[in-house]
């Protein structure tokens, strides 16, 4: 037991030293661990600070991005709303355009149908117009042919009465005569001539002008132009003034109206004697020219239209039968062709070369210079167309060939008391011998005067013819004049038709200028032109006397069957006869058919008035 006591001590000392070493080692580990913990804590704190700063930055960036996103989102929303609005507008416009397109398509189809229908109607109308134009042209030609046949018919003595005409045609005739300044015959004068209408007036009413021709519209103005030009440049004949004659054709058989519209007396003062130069012929007397110049108004005796460029008139009588254009017509009427001038000059030479019969002109001092003999009738029948011309010598008379009977209007002798067979034969004979003859030929014939110093009025003839004779003076002792009833009735009819010598009456103005040196006397029964015979049928004939006033003795006739219209006495001491140039004597061209038509018209009128 003692031995055991020492051992626990030593064991206790050994255990405490080992524990001391273990405690120091643990103390060291504990300090090292504490260092590591502080380092880690410090590091963690740094990391936490960095994390906080980073999170703060990210939060700021996030807010900024959020704001930008919001802005972009708003923009997109506005853009989307605008787009939707535009889509709606576009849809509406598209719908509207579609509807308009549909409407226009329908209208286009409807208008296409209408165009097709209108084209068909236009084609039908064109065909109808063409047919109507052809029918109208045929009707116009037929009407003009009827009017021409009416003027050229053989019934020259036919008197048309207003009461026998249709009612509508009566109105047309009345309007035509009122328009052109004439009137129907008065039943108070002579009942046999009352209610009668001249054939030429009926023909004028029936005739239809060509719508494509301007000649009917321009003929009046061109005729007036020619009249003024002839009165100004060539102081000679002129168209008559309306106051010179009666207002209608009734002057020839209405002696009761002789005091109305009478021409002025010979005693009227004359202010311009030389205006009417060579009215009757180159042998006409000065006093006669003075008296005729006094019968016209002052306006016609003055050169009122100096330098007025006038054109030759174009006849409207054949306007509806004209197949040429207006340019060709005016070109033909502007000047004489070479062939016509040659024919005219040849005619003058042949006519002037003929000799008058010595028995007829032997006692006339005015024809002392003329030759001795006249050609045979066969030679006279070969006379060219233009028989009457102006003598180039003052003392030489007109030559009038024997063929002039065939050249005068047929009605002048168709009313004579002879068998109808002879009249028909004469008509057939003259139809083949017509020449360019105007009514101025008839109007140019002068009659022996029955009373000296009286005005040249157409009523002077009617006073004798219907009133029981005139003066008892010898026709061979009275001066010639232009008081022929043919001349007066022609001038009156020219105004009654209202054309002022424009429709073919100026086809031969040389006969107006030449005047009427050809007197009608009963002594020349064998002369070319048979005269008028009254209803008594005594057989007296009024031949063509180829001498001037007082040139040859003639038998006296006091009965009212002798035609003795008064004229104006004149003396050859005033001024010498004038000489006309060929241009004055033949200023008109291309009038063969026109002159014939006008001559037939006037001849029918004379037959109606003097029947």
UniProtKB/Swiss-Prot annotation:
Biased composition (Basic and acidic residues): 554-563
Tissue spec. comment: Brain-specific. Expressed in neurons and rather enriched at synaptic junctions.
UniProt modified residues of type Asymmetric dimethylarginine: 399
Keyword Nucleus: no
Membrane topology: Peripheral membrane protein
Annotated function: May sustain the structure of the postsynaptic density (PSD).
UniProt name for this protein: Brain-enriched guanylate kinase-associated protein
Native organism: Rattus norvegicus (Rat)
């Amino acid at each position: 037991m003692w031995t055991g006591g020492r051992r626990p001590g030593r064991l206790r000392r050994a255990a405490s030293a080992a524990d001391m070493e273990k405690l120091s080692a643990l103390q060291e580990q504990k300090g090292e661990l504490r260092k590591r913990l502080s380092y880690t804590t410090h590091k963690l704190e740094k990391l936490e600070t960095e994390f906080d700063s980073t999170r703060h930055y990210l939060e700021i960036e996030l807010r900024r991005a959020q704001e930008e996103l919001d802005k972009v989102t708003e923009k997109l929303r506005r853009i989307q709303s605008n787009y939707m609005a535009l889509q709606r507008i576009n849809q509406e416009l598209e719908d509207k355009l579609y509807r308009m397109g549909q409407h226009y398509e329908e209208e286009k189809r409807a208008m296409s149908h209408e165009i097709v229908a209108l084209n068909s109607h236009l084609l039908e109308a064109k065909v109808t117009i063409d047919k109507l134009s052809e029918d109208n042209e045929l009707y116009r030609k037929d009407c003009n042919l009827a009017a021409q046949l009416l003027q050229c018919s053989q019934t020259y003595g036919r008197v048309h009465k207003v009461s026998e005409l249709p009612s509508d045609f009566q109105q047309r005739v009345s309007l035509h005569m009122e328009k052109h300044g004439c009137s129907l015959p008065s039943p108070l004068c002579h009942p046999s001539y009352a209610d009668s209408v001249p054939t030429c007036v009926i023909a004028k009413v029936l005739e239809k002008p060509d719508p494509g021709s301007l000649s009917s519209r321009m003929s009046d103005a061109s005729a007036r132009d020619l009249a003024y030009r002839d009165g100004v440049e060539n102081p000679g004949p002129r168209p008559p003034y309306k106051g010179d004659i009666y207002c209608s054709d009734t002057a020839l058989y209405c002696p009761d109206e002789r005091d109305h519209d009478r021409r002025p007396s010979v005693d009227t003062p004359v202010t311009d004697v030389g205006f009417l130069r060579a009215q009757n012929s180159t042998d006409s007397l000065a006093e006669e020219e003075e008296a005729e110049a006094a019968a016209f108004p002052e306006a016609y005796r003055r050169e009122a239209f100096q330098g007025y460029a006038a054109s030759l008139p174009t006849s409207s009588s054949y306007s509806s039968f004209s197949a040429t254009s207006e340019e060709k017509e005016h070109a033909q009427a502007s000047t004489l062709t070479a062939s016509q001038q040659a024919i005219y000059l040849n005619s003058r030479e042949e006519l002037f070369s003929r000799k008058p019969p010595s028995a007829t002109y032997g006692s006339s001092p005015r024809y002392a210079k003329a030759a001795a003999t006249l050609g045979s009738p066969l030679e006279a029948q070969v006379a060219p167309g233009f028989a009457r011309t102006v003598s180039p010598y003052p003392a030489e008379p007109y030559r009038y060939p024997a063929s002039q009977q065939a050249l005068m209007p047929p009605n002048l002798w168709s009313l004579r008391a002879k068998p109808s067979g002879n009249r028909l034969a004469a008509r057939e004979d003259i139809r083949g011998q017509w020449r360019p003859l105007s009514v101025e030929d008839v109007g140019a014939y002068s009659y022996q005067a029955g009373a000296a110093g009286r005005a040249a009025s157409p009523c002077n003839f009617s006073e004798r013819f219907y009133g029981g004779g005139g003066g008892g003076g010898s026709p061979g002792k009275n001066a010639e004049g232009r008081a022929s009833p043919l001349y007066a009735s022609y001038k009156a009819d020219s105004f009654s038709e209202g054309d002022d010598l424009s429709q073919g009456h100026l086809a031969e103005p040389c006969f107006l200028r030449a005047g009427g040196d050809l007197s009608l006397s009963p002594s020349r029964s064998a002369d070319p032109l048979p005269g008028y015979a009254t209803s008594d049928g005594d057989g007296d004939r009024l031949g063509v006397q180829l001498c001037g006033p007082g040139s040859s003795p003639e038998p006296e006739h006091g009965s009212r069957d002798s035609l003795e219209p008064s004229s104006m006495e004149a003396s050859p001491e005033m001024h010498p006869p004038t000489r006309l140039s060929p241009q004055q004597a033949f200023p008109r061209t291309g009038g063969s058919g026109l002159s014939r038509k006008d001559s037939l018209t006037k001849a029918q009128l004379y037959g109606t008035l003097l029947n």
